[in-house]
Protein backbone atom coordinates (compact mmCIF):
# COMPACT_ATOMS: atom_id res chain seq x y z
CA UNK A 1 0.00 0.00 0.00
CA UNK A 2 2.90 2.38 0.79
CA UNK A 3 4.16 1.85 -2.76
CA UNK A 4 0.71 2.66 -4.16
CA UNK A 5 0.52 5.87 -2.10
CA UNK A 6 4.10 6.88 -2.94
CA UNK A 7 3.72 6.54 -6.72
CA UNK A 8 0.25 8.15 -6.57
CA UNK A 9 1.74 11.19 -4.81
CA UNK A 10 4.15 11.63 -7.74
CA UNK A 11 1.22 11.59 -10.14
CA UNK A 12 -0.73 14.07 -8.01
CA UNK A 13 2.20 16.51 -7.90
CA UNK A 14 2.50 16.29 -11.70
CA UNK A 15 -1.24 17.08 -11.98
CA UNK A 16 -0.89 19.94 -9.48
CA UNK A 17 1.97 21.45 -11.52
CA UNK A 18 -0.08 21.06 -14.69
CA UNK A 19 -3.00 22.87 -13.01
CA UNK A 20 -0.70 25.74 -11.94
CA UNK A 21 0.74 25.89 -15.47
CA UNK A 22 -2.59 27.07 -16.93
CA UNK A 23 -2.40 30.41 -15.08
CA UNK A 24 1.32 30.76 -15.82
CA UNK A 25 0.72 30.24 -19.55
CA UNK A 26 -2.10 32.79 -19.49
CA UNK A 27 0.25 35.40 -17.98
CA UNK A 28 3.05 34.51 -20.40
CA UNK A 29 0.66 35.17 -23.25
CA UNK A 30 -0.31 38.56 -21.78
CA UNK A 31 3.34 39.60 -21.24
CA UNK A 32 4.74 38.42 -24.57
CA UNK A 33 6.47 35.52 -22.77
CA UNK A 34 8.36 37.74 -20.33
CA UNK A 35 9.30 35.34 -17.52
CA UNK A 36 10.55 38.05 -15.12
CA UNK A 37 7.26 39.94 -15.57
CA UNK A 38 5.25 36.79 -14.87
CA UNK A 39 7.41 36.04 -11.84
CA UNK A 40 6.71 39.55 -10.51
CA UNK A 41 2.95 39.25 -11.06
CA UNK A 42 2.70 35.82 -9.44
CA UNK A 43 4.89 36.84 -6.50
CA UNK A 44 2.66 39.87 -5.91
CA UNK A 45 -0.41 37.62 -6.13
CA UNK A 46 1.07 35.28 -3.53
CA UNK A 47 1.83 38.18 -1.16
CA UNK A 48 -1.89 38.95 -1.21
CA UNK A 49 -2.67 35.50 0.21
CA UNK A 50 -6.05 33.99 -0.75
CA UNK A 51 -8.05 36.99 0.53
CA UNK A 52 -6.32 39.68 -1.55
CA UNK A 53 -4.54 37.72 -4.29
CA UNK A 54 -6.65 39.09 -7.17
CA UNK A 55 -6.13 42.74 -6.20
CA UNK A 56 -2.39 42.25 -5.61
CA UNK A 57 -1.99 40.64 -9.04
CA UNK A 58 -3.99 43.46 -10.63
CA UNK A 59 -1.71 46.02 -8.93
CA UNK A 60 1.41 44.21 -10.20
CA UNK A 61 0.02 44.25 -13.74
CA UNK A 62 -0.13 48.07 -13.64
CA UNK A 63 3.54 48.40 -12.58
CA UNK A 64 5.93 46.72 -15.01
CA UNK A 65 9.33 45.33 -13.95
CA UNK A 66 10.90 48.10 -16.05
CA UNK A 67 9.09 50.75 -14.00
CA UNK A 68 10.02 48.98 -10.76
CA UNK A 69 13.68 48.91 -11.81
CA UNK A 70 13.66 52.70 -12.28
CA UNK A 71 12.66 53.20 -8.65
CA UNK A 72 14.14 50.14 -6.95
CA UNK A 73 16.76 52.16 -5.06
CA UNK A 74 14.11 54.37 -3.43
CA UNK A 75 12.08 52.28 -0.99
CA UNK A 76 9.61 55.13 -0.36
CA UNK A 77 8.84 55.39 -4.06
CA UNK A 78 8.27 51.62 -4.30
CA UNK A 79 5.94 51.71 -1.29
CA UNK A 80 4.12 54.72 -2.76
CA UNK A 81 3.65 52.93 -6.10
CA UNK A 82 2.32 49.71 -4.58
CA UNK A 83 0.16 51.20 -1.85
CA UNK A 84 -1.09 53.94 -4.17
CA UNK A 85 -2.01 51.60 -7.01
CA UNK A 86 -3.87 49.42 -4.49
CA UNK A 87 -6.00 52.44 -3.55
CA UNK A 88 -4.53 52.71 -0.04
CA UNK A 89 -3.34 56.31 -0.35
CA UNK A 90 -6.69 57.94 -1.14
CA UNK A 91 -7.77 59.22 2.28
CA UNK A 92 -6.73 62.22 4.40
CA UNK A 93 -3.70 61.36 6.54
CA UNK A 94 -2.24 63.05 9.62
CA UNK A 95 0.87 60.86 9.99
CA UNK A 96 3.79 62.55 8.20
CA UNK A 97 5.07 59.26 6.73
CA UNK A 98 1.68 58.52 5.15
CA UNK A 99 1.43 62.12 3.88
CA UNK A 100 4.90 61.78 2.32
CA UNK A 101 3.92 58.52 0.56
CA UNK A 102 0.70 60.09 -0.70
CA UNK A 103 2.61 63.07 -2.11
CA UNK A 104 5.16 60.73 -3.73
CA UNK A 105 2.39 58.64 -5.25
CA UNK A 106 0.53 61.62 -6.72
CA UNK A 107 3.73 62.71 -8.45
CA UNK A 108 4.48 59.21 -9.82
CA UNK A 109 0.85 58.63 -10.83
CA UNK A 110 0.87 61.81 -12.89
CA UNK A 111 4.34 61.15 -14.34
CA UNK A 112 3.49 57.63 -15.55
CA UNK A 113 -0.24 58.21 -16.14
CA UNK A 114 -1.15 55.37 -13.81
CA UNK A 115 -4.70 54.27 -13.05
CA UNK A 116 -5.47 53.19 -9.49
CA UNK A 117 -6.95 49.70 -9.09
CA UNK A 118 -10.45 49.81 -7.65
CA UNK A 119 -10.60 46.34 -6.12
CA UNK A 120 -11.58 46.04 -2.46
CA UNK A 121 -8.80 44.93 -0.15
CA UNK A 122 -9.82 42.82 2.83
CA UNK A 123 -8.63 43.56 6.36
CA UNK A 124 -11.46 41.95 8.35
CA UNK A 125 -10.81 38.70 10.22
CA UNK A 126 -7.14 38.80 9.23
CA UNK A 127 -4.12 38.71 11.49
CA UNK A 128 -2.43 42.13 11.49
CA UNK A 129 0.74 40.46 10.14
CA UNK A 130 -1.26 39.62 6.98
CA UNK A 131 -2.80 43.08 6.50
CA UNK A 132 -2.44 44.16 2.85
CA UNK A 133 -0.69 47.40 3.88
CA UNK A 134 2.12 45.46 5.56
CA UNK A 135 2.33 42.78 2.86
CA UNK A 136 2.69 45.49 0.17
CA UNK A 137 5.42 47.17 2.24
CA UNK A 138 7.27 43.83 2.46
CA UNK A 139 6.81 43.30 -1.28
CA UNK A 140 8.30 46.76 -1.88
CA UNK A 141 11.32 45.78 0.22
CA UNK A 142 11.77 42.56 -1.76
CA UNK A 143 11.93 44.63 -4.98
CA UNK A 144 14.26 47.13 -3.27
CA UNK A 145 16.73 44.46 -2.15
CA UNK A 146 16.85 42.29 -5.26
CA UNK A 147 16.90 42.42 -9.03
CA UNK A 148 16.23 39.88 -11.79
CA UNK A 149 14.76 37.58 -9.17
CA UNK A 150 13.63 34.87 -11.55
CA UNK A 151 17.12 34.63 -13.09
CA UNK A 152 18.49 34.19 -9.57
CA UNK A 153 15.95 31.44 -8.90
CA UNK A 154 17.09 29.62 -12.04
CA UNK A 155 20.74 29.92 -10.98
CA UNK A 156 20.20 28.99 -7.32
CA UNK A 157 21.83 25.76 -6.24
CA UNK A 158 19.83 25.29 -3.05
CA UNK A 159 16.50 26.13 -1.49
CA UNK A 160 18.33 27.92 1.37
CA UNK A 161 19.72 30.44 -1.16
CA UNK A 162 16.18 31.34 -2.20
CA UNK A 163 15.03 31.58 1.43
CA UNK A 164 17.82 34.05 2.15
CA UNK A 165 16.74 36.21 -0.82
CA UNK A 166 13.10 36.18 0.21
CA UNK A 167 13.34 36.82 3.93
CA UNK A 168 13.10 40.60 3.83
CA UNK A 169 12.07 42.99 6.60
CA UNK A 170 9.73 45.91 5.91
CA UNK A 171 10.96 49.51 6.17
CA UNK A 172 11.42 51.01 9.69
CA UNK A 173 8.02 52.78 9.75
CA UNK A 174 6.29 49.40 9.69
CA UNK A 175 8.04 48.18 12.86
CA UNK A 176 5.49 50.28 14.77
CA UNK A 177 2.60 50.05 12.28
CA UNK A 178 0.40 47.49 10.53
CA UNK A 179 -1.56 50.20 8.72
CA UNK A 180 -0.87 53.79 7.68
CA UNK A 181 -3.16 55.27 10.29
CA UNK A 182 -2.58 53.44 13.58
CA UNK A 183 0.61 52.93 15.58
CA UNK A 184 1.26 49.58 17.29
CA UNK A 185 3.90 48.23 19.71
CA UNK A 186 7.36 47.75 18.17
CA UNK A 187 7.89 44.53 16.24
CA UNK A 188 10.32 44.03 13.35
CA UNK A 189 8.17 43.10 10.35
CA UNK A 190 10.22 40.42 8.63
CA UNK A 191 8.48 38.19 6.10
CA UNK A 192 8.76 35.11 8.30
CA UNK A 193 9.45 31.44 7.67
CA UNK A 194 5.89 30.33 6.89
CA UNK A 195 5.37 33.10 4.30
CA UNK A 196 8.75 32.34 2.68
CA UNK A 197 7.79 28.64 2.47
CA UNK A 198 4.37 29.63 1.11
CA UNK A 199 6.04 31.64 -1.68
CA UNK A 200 8.33 28.74 -2.55
CA UNK A 201 5.50 26.19 -2.61
CA UNK A 202 2.85 28.23 -4.44
CA UNK A 203 4.83 30.48 -6.78
CA UNK A 204 8.54 29.81 -7.16
CA UNK A 205 8.56 26.02 -7.51
CA UNK A 206 5.56 25.81 -9.92
CA UNK A 207 7.04 28.60 -12.09
CA UNK A 208 10.48 26.97 -12.08
CA UNK A 209 8.88 23.62 -13.00
CA UNK A 210 6.92 25.15 -15.88
CA UNK A 211 9.97 27.04 -17.19
CA UNK A 212 11.98 23.80 -17.15
CA UNK A 213 9.15 21.88 -18.87
CA UNK A 214 8.94 24.50 -21.62
CA UNK A 215 12.70 24.59 -22.17
CA UNK A 216 13.23 20.81 -21.91
CA UNK A 217 15.45 21.14 -18.86
CA UNK A 218 14.78 17.97 -16.93
CA UNK A 219 17.52 18.71 -14.39
CA UNK A 220 15.79 21.96 -13.41
CA UNK A 221 12.44 20.15 -13.15
CA UNK A 222 14.03 17.64 -10.79
CA UNK A 223 15.54 20.52 -8.80
CA UNK A 224 12.04 22.03 -8.37
CA UNK A 225 10.59 18.75 -7.08
CA UNK A 226 13.60 18.20 -4.80
CA UNK A 227 13.11 21.67 -3.29
CA UNK A 228 9.50 20.75 -2.56
CA UNK A 229 10.75 17.71 -0.64
CA UNK A 230 13.16 19.87 1.34
CA UNK A 231 10.40 22.17 2.61
CA UNK A 232 8.43 21.35 5.77
CA UNK A 233 4.92 19.94 5.45
CA UNK A 234 2.11 22.48 5.54
CA UNK A 235 -0.04 22.81 8.61
CA UNK A 236 -3.69 23.57 7.89
CA UNK A 237 -7.14 22.14 8.48
CA UNK A 238 -6.88 19.65 5.59
CA UNK A 239 -3.37 18.39 6.39
CA UNK A 240 -4.48 17.87 10.01
CA UNK A 241 -7.40 15.75 8.75
CA UNK A 242 -4.94 13.57 6.84
CA UNK A 243 -2.82 13.24 9.99
CA UNK A 244 -5.87 12.09 11.94
CA UNK A 245 -6.39 9.36 9.34
CA UNK A 246 -2.73 8.27 9.90
CA UNK A 247 -1.68 9.18 6.36
CA UNK A 248 2.06 9.78 6.38
CA UNK A 249 3.27 13.10 5.03
CA UNK A 250 6.77 14.28 5.85
CA UNK A 251 7.33 17.37 3.71
CA UNK A 252 5.72 19.94 1.40
CA UNK A 253 5.81 17.48 -1.53
CA UNK A 254 3.56 15.13 0.45
CA UNK A 255 1.24 17.82 1.85
CA UNK A 256 0.78 19.42 -1.59
CA UNK A 257 -0.12 16.00 -3.04
CA UNK A 258 -2.64 15.39 -0.25
CA UNK A 259 -4.21 18.86 -0.56
CA UNK A 260 -4.64 18.28 -4.30
CA UNK A 261 -6.03 14.78 -3.66
CA UNK A 262 -8.65 16.07 -1.19
CA UNK A 263 -9.86 18.87 -3.47
CA UNK A 264 -9.72 17.12 -6.85
CA UNK A 265 -10.51 13.50 -5.97
CA UNK A 266 -12.10 13.12 -2.50
CA UNK A 267 -14.36 16.18 -2.69
CA UNK A 268 -15.19 15.41 -6.33
CA UNK A 269 -16.01 11.77 -5.37
CA UNK A 270 -13.53 10.43 -7.93
CA UNK A 271 -12.64 7.41 -5.78
CA UNK A 272 -12.58 5.05 -8.77
CA UNK A 273 -9.99 7.23 -10.51
CA UNK A 274 -7.83 7.39 -7.39
CA UNK A 275 -5.09 4.80 -6.77
CA UNK A 276 -5.71 4.88 -3.01
CA UNK A 277 -9.49 4.67 -3.46
CA UNK A 278 -9.08 1.72 -5.81
CA UNK A 279 -6.78 -0.10 -3.40
CA UNK A 280 -9.32 0.35 -0.56
CA UNK A 281 -12.27 -0.75 -2.72
CA UNK A 282 -10.41 -3.89 -3.82
CA UNK A 283 -9.95 -4.87 -0.17
CA UNK A 284 -13.66 -4.51 0.67
Which residues make up each language-model segment?
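Long, contiguous, compositionally biased segments that the model treats as domain-scale units
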Residues: 1-7
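Acidic, carboxylate-rich catalytic segments that either coordinate divalent cations
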Residues: 244-284
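Hydrophobic, aromatic-lined core segments that form the binding pocket/scaffold
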Residues: 12-255
Amino acid sequence: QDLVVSSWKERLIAERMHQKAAHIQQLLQQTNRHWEEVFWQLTARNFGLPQNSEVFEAVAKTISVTLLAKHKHQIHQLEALLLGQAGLLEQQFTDEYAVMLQKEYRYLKKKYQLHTIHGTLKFLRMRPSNFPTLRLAQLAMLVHQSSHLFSKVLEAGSVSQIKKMLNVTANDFWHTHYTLTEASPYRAKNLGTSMVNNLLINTIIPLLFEYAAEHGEQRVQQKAIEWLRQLPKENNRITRLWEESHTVHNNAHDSQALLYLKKNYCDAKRCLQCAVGNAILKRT
